[in-house]
């Protein structure tokens, strides 16, 4: 849940930063041209933030669904979806950093949190797979 809260706050922060951005200009053949017009910049940030917002909040939602699963198959499915979303969040965080929307300190902090979630979920999913395999061996 705490990771989802961080993602929401980061989303709000980045969108506010983008909304306050000023265009940068360069001169080409004596004409002043906007290198990165604000609407284009704002749209880029919004798209990336939206992707992180979706994957980052989906981790907690799927984890809650797994915790309250109605069957073992449902628990397994939701756990693996949560892992997939956590890995996707790492991708979006990395992309935001590589494109200059997150500074090194912001990146390292939230990336470490997402990585920790991935490790926890990998452990859970491995355990689920081992239990499933053990039950299949018992049936034989």
Segments (PLM) and residue ranges:
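Short, C-terminally biased terminal segments at protein or domain edges
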Residues: 1-65, 69-140
């Amino acid at each position: 849940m705490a990771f989802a809260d961080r993602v929401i706050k980061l989303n709000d922060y980045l969108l506010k930063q983008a909304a306050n951005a000023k265009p940068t200009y360069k001169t080409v053949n004596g004409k002043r041209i906007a290198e990165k017009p604000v609407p284009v910049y704002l749209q880029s940030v919004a798209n990336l933030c939206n992707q992180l917002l979706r994957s980052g909040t989906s981790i907690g939602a799927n984890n809650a669904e797994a915790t309250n699963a109605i069957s073992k198959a449902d628990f397994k499915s939701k756990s693996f979806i949560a892992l997939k979303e956590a890995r996707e969040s790492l991708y979006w965080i990395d992309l935001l950093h590589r494109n200059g929307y997150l500074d090194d300190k912001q990146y390292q902090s939230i990336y470490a949190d997402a990585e920790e979630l991935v490790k926890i979920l990998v452990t859970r999913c491995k355990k689920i797979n081992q239990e499933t395999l053990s039950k299949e061996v018992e049936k034989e």
